[in-house]
């Protein structure tokens, strides 16, 4: 059994040796056709870029492909030259309100409602309507907080 376990460990070490020998057998990159180079670059670039980020880089990649080969930038260089994103694209990572405890999420949601009225030009009737909606949201929020507090307090064992 021990010999059988050791054999698979030794096998993955042998392919890198074959890879080390391969570059000497292949022709130099200058002699190989540009189509072969592009297919090799594409495979390595697909591994480098997550699928979610590609739509943002598409216009810059198309511009770079139109240039002559000497001036053309690789996709990795384009990606590194861009400033980091402030927020991840949709579907990547958690939504900012999903992180943290219940009270932290509740505290983060409040500024959204607080600033809702101030940036608008509303008539008195509209302002009263929006204020009533906000009060109703506050009541519902407080009710949920009390229910959450009671549920946590009445458990036989702490969470």
Curated annotation (Swiss-Prot):
Domain of life: Eukaryota
Stretches the record annotates as Disordered: 1-120
Pfam families (alphabetical): BEX
Annotated InterPro entries: TF_A-like/BEX
Extent of Acidic residues compositional bias: 37-54
Biased composition (Basic and acidic residues): 17-34, 64-80, 95-119
Keyword list, A-Z: Nucleus, Transcription, Transcription regulation
GO cellular component terms listed in the entry, alphabetical order: nucleus
Protein localization: Nucleus
Function, as annotated: May be involved in transcriptional regulation. Modulates various viral and cellular promoters in a promoter context-dependent manner. Does not bind DNA directly.
Family statement drawn from the similarity comment of this UniProt entry: Belongs to the TFS-II family. TFA subfamily.
Protein name: Transcription elongation factor A protein-like 1
Native source organism of the sequence: Bos taurus (Bovine)
High-level lineage: Eukaryota, Metazoa, Chordata, Craniata, Vertebrata
UniProt gene name: TCEAL1
